[in-house]
């Protein structure tokens, strides 16, 4: 895990992926091996959110096609293998003043600004209700469990990888907020809209965040929906998100996901047969 040498096994595949990305002008930064078996992390350079969503969309298609050429399958499923870490799409966000080019998350003296804290407050207040937008499938919620390198709540902290909202170590101009809740299975366009909408509401309403989590956030309670059905209910009950994202979009999205959830509920899992068939 986290090894440059571990990537060598996949050198032919990744050389081809890099070639494709260069030709498509996708701004890929680094590639490292992650904790899971055959799990890789790709980082993109910072960019305009819409342009970056375009890049992520094309990158996913590129990786899948390149993998097939090497007799492999690439998946962006949130939790494809039990007992292995899931896959996320962490989104780092900062806001730049168009007139001055200054990062509004930092004061002139280099300290964190009120806008920085209000943005975090908005993420904490609204991410639970917006969860279904970035955890769009029943499998998405299997990733979000204790001690699996995925968050279970929306605590925030500086360089704390157990929280849902992290502020990485950086210079004042590069101060940013990382949303660690979003899964690799999320639509990048919807993910960008979701996290920006939550942060925007925090700025608009001057929402103060909870005190910073200094320790292990896994010791704190769950504060995110535990299933697709629960997440759908939470989004339906949040009028502020309806207003920002559009009522028609929220209605159509939740109705489609409700149909998918209904189909899932018709499936009887092997776990249920193993534990219940001859024991109840």
Regions found by a protein language model. Name each.
Residues 1-280:
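Glycine-rich, acidic/polar active-site loops that bind/position phosphate-bearing ligands
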């Amino acid at each position: 895990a986290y090894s440059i040498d571990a990537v060598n096994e996949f050198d032919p595949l990744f050389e081809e992926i890099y070639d494709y990305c260069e030709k498509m002008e996708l701004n890929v930064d680094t590639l490292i091996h992650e904790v899971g078996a055959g799990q890789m992390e790709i980082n993109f350079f910072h960019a305009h959110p819409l342009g970056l969503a375009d890049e992520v969309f094309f990158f996913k298609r590129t990786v899948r096609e390149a993998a097939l050429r090497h007799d492999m399958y690439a998946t962006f499923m949130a939790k494809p293998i039990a007992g292995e870490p899931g896959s996320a799409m962490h989104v780092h966000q900062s806001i730049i003043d168009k007139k001055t080019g200054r990062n509004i998350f930092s004061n002139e003296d280099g300290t964190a600004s009120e806008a920085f804290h209000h943005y975090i407050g908005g993420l904490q207040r609204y991410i639970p209700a917006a969860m279904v937008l970035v955890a769009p499938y029943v499998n998405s919620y299997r990733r979000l469990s204790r001690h699996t390198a995925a968050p279970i709540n929306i605590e925030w902290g500086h360089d704390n990888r157990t929280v849902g909202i992290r502020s990485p170590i950086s210079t004042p101009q590069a101060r940013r907020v990382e949303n660690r809740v979003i899964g690799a299975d999320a639509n990048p366009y919807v993910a960008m809209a979701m996290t920006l909408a939550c942060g925007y509401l925090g700025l608009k309403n001057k929402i103060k965040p909870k005190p910073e989590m200094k320790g292990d956030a896994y010791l704190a309670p769950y504060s995110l929906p535990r299933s697709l059905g629960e997440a759908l209910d939470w989004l339906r009950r949040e009028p502020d998100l309806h207003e920002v994202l559009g009522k028609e979009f929220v209605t159509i999205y939740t109705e489609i996901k409700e149909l998918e959830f209904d189909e899932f509920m018709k499936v009887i899992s092997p776990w249920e047969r193993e534990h219940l068939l001859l024991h109840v």
